[in-house]
Amino acid sequence: MAEITFKGGPVTLVGQEVKVGDQAPDFTVLTNSLEEKSLADMKGKVTIISVIPSIDTGVCDAQTRRFNEEAAKLGDVNVYTISADLPFAQARWCGANGIDKVETLSDHRDMSFGEAFGVYIKELRLLARSVFVLDENGKVVYAEYVSEATNHPNYEKPIEAAKALVK
């Protein structure tokens, strides 16, 4: 199990840590229009999943903007940002900030993604900052659990992993 801190204090992650080589576990999240989306909907394309605690914080804002910029250069790759924010808040933020290459998804309903990927912070009901890259069959080829949730993830490594898979 990954161990992380939030503002310097240890927190409990619920679920099983996902590792490179694992088949990504199934989950269900909500789109901004309240439609369900699952792992099955992501298969068939290389997928980057950027996980953030809340879209309305500085690092999460910067992380989502960075992956939106990178998504424009990647070609046929799914790029998602998942948080526990309400879908309406995600849609408002994306609209206000011109985010159109990354699709935001909400895990607020039942934390299905958070538990499946081992990123659900029990004490805060938020998701831990992390990044995953899946191949077109849903196999994990990159996984990063950021050790301090208020820090930035590595941006270059997941982008490189996704580029290596695009044919």
Swiss-Prot record:
Domain of life: Bacteria
Reactions mediated catalytically: a hydroperoxide + [thioredoxin]-dithiol = an alcohol + [thioredoxin]-disulfide + H2O
Keywords for the protein's UniProt record, in alphabetical order: Antioxidant, Disulfide bond, Oxidoreductase, Peroxidase, Redox-active center
Gene3D superfamilies: Glutaredoxin (3.40.30.10)
SUPFAM superfamilies named among the record's database cross-references: Thioredoxin-like
Recorded GO MF terms: thioredoxin peroxidase activity
Cystine pairs: 60-94, 60-94
Thioredoxin domain span: 18-167
Induction: By superoxide.
CDD domains: PRX_Atyp2cys
E.C. no: 1.11.1.24
Entry-linked Pfam families: Redoxin
Top EC group: oxidoreductase
Active site: 60
UniProt keyword Cell membrane present: no
Family: Belongs to the peroxiredoxin family. Tpx subfamily.
Quaternary organization: Homodimer.
Task of the protein: Thiol-specific peroxidase that catalyzes the reduction of hydrogen peroxide and organic hydroperoxides to water and alcohols, respectively. Plays a role in cell protection against oxidative stress by detoxifying peroxides.
Misc. comment: The active site is a conserved redox-active cysteine residue, the peroxidatic cysteine (C(P)), which makes the nucleophilic attack on the peroxide substrate. The peroxide oxidizes the C(P)-SH to cysteine sulfenic acid (C(P)-SOH), which then reacts with another cysteine residue, the resolving cysteine (C(R)), to form a disulfide bridge. The disulfide is subsequently reduced by an appropriate electron donor to complete the catalytic cycle. In this atypical 2-Cys peroxiredoxin, C(R) is present in the same subunit to form an intramolecular disulfide.
Cross-referenced PANTHER family: THIOL PEROXIDASE
Protein name: Thiol peroxidase
